[in-house]
């Protein structure tokens, strides 16, 4: 998931992501771990960009999460931060 936020919400949003959102996503049981990163380059004057990579063992588990859990967890972000962020998903596969 790639997320771009307005700088004014950075502290509150980071706290929410680390203490609430990411733990809630992991607590669904569909993902094994998460890696939370900040984009350093290219620098964007309009906002701050972050990424969370959630790892799961099967595509089926990912699809179940999207269908059963994602809408309500995503809504919590909109309820709290409104239009001060944008987020989009990318589905990737690890190549060993």
Where are these regions (language model features)?
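Short amphipathic alpha-helical segments
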Residues: 9-36, 74-75
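Structured segments of extracytoplasmic/periplasmic soluble domains
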Residues: 28, 68-69
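Short, well-ordered beta-strand segments in beta-rich or mixed alpha/beta enzyme
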Residues: 1-4, 36-68
